[in-house]
A protein has these predicted regions:
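Core dinuclear metal-dependent hydrolase active-site scaffold
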Residues: 6-10, 57-60, 145-174
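Active-site metal-binding loops of divalent metal-dependent hydrolases
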Residues: 10-12, 64, 68-72, 100, ...
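Metallo-beta-lactamase
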Residues: 80, 92-103, 110, 115-158, 164-234, ...
Length: 234
């Protein structure tokens, strides 16, 4: 019997714009719509801020793993979502971080003293310095190299571009291979659908396209991006 992947808290974006002299929220029904609003407001010089929830996932294997707990506001919903599945949050022993950007890490405060698997390049990255208080609450297990196995049927590969130590998780399920690609895939779903990024996307453009091709060649049943709904490919 294969493992399973479930979304505990789905991705969403909350964008704020300067309107009438103060910050106002801009409603969006999906994370992708929120990103388009953000791009438009940025071009108009009206962005006041954006908060982005990543997909927080549960992998059910020989052990249960929480993947990318997310920003601090996701902590309570994640715990409630686990409880609704009959899993008490205190029974979760291991958490996996695809990378160590703050929007994927903050809610680790819900899982103190757990073993946290994260690539060593992320632990050493300068942006983790202001998260040190959170990381000090857990037991870091550094992953190294370009690939590895966490347990049979649960592997990881390094997929840099968005972050040098970003890993994608490869999970064997009864429906086929599921890839939790995190922020390797995004920020809009049509980019991955079309395997194309705007020419002015940024310095990571070519690396991301290489990683997308690599993911496609794995022939996955489903890909879970960081900030968009899962994509079923067959």
């Amino acid at each position: 019997m294969g493992h399973s992947v479930e979304i505990l808290v789905p991705a969403q974006r909350y964008v704020f714009a300067i309107e009438n002299g103060h910050a106002e929220p801009q409603p969006a029904s999906t994370s992708a719509e929120g990103f388009k609003i953000f791009k438009r407001l940025r071009s108009e010089g009206k962005v006041a801020g954006m908060v982005a929830f990543p997909n927080c996932c549960l992998i059910r294997a020989a052990e249960d793993y929480v993947v990318d707990p997310g920003i601090i506001m996701q902590g309570a919903p994640t715990s409630s979502s686990l409880s609704a599945r009959g899993i008490e949050p205190h029974t979760i022993k291991k958490v996996i971080l695809t990378h160590a950007h703050f929007d994927h890490v903050e809610a680790l405060v819900e899982f103190p003293q757990r073993e946290v698997l994260v690539h060593e390049l992320e632990v050493e990255a300068p942006y983790t310095a202001f998260l040190q208080g959170v990381l000090d609450m857990v037991k870091i297990k550094k992953l190294s190299g370009d690939e590895g196995e966490i347990e049979p049927g649960l592997r990881w590969i390094r997929t840099p571009g968005h972050a040098d130590g970003l890993i994608s998780l490869l999970i064997d399920t009864d429906d086929g291979l599921v890839v939790i690609a995190s922020d390797c895939v995004g920020p809009l779903p049509e980019y991955f659908d079309e395997m194309s990024l705007p020419e002015d996307f940024g310095p990571e453009r070519e690396e991301l396209l290489r990683q997308w091709q690599r993911i496609r060649e794995l022939d996955p049943h489903m890909v879970v991006p960081g900030h968009n709904p899962p994509v079923v490919l067959d």
